[in-house]
């Protein structure tokens, strides 16, 4: 697992609801689920990566965060994670606003 993911995992407490935005192949999600007993969900725009996550037994939906995050209720997750994805957005400020709205705590790494 990448060092960055190790740092993020140290921040997140056990038995929490976590949303991983731009979750990639689900490496961080799988760790948080198996080692910390977190209820982890993912949002990923790339169909092939969504399929990899599903094959790992992870709960991931395919979608664009700039369009999909608005649908999540306020403070519906204990933690929202955005790792190495911010630069990919056309409107990063709006994405950050949504992350702060959805999560009780938000973790962003660049």
List the predicted regions and their residue ranges:
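Conserved alpha-helix/loop element of class I SAM-dependent methyltransferases that forms part
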Residues: 1-15
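Conserved class I S-adenosyl-L-methionine
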Residues: 16-24
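Class I SAM-dependent methyltransferase SAM/SAH-binding core
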Residues: 27, 31-68
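Short conserved loop adjoining the S-adenosyl-L-methionine
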Residues: 68-74
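A conserved beta-strand element that flanks and buttresses the S-adenosyl-L-methionine
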Residues: 81
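Short catalytic micro-motifs in class I SAM-dependent methyltransferases
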Residues: 84-85
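A short, conserved alpha-helix within the catalytic core of class I
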Residues: 89-98, 102
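Conserved beta-strand signature within the Rossmann-like core of class I S-adenosyl-L-methionine
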Residues: 103-110
């Amino acid at each position: 697992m990448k060092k960055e993911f190790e740092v993020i995992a140290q921040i997140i407490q056990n038995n929490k609801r976590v949303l991983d935005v731009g979750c990639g192949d689900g490496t961080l999600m799988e760790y948080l689920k198996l080692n910390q007993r977190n209820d982890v969900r993912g949002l990923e725009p790339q169909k092939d990566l969504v399929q990899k996550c599903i094959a790992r037994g992870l709960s991931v939906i395919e979608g664009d965060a700039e369009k999909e995050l608005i649908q999540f209720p306020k403070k519906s997750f204990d933690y929202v994670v955005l790792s190495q994805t911010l630069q990919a957005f056309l409107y990063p400020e709006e994405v950050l606003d949504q992350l702060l709205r959805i999560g009780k705590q938000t973790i962003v790494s660049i």
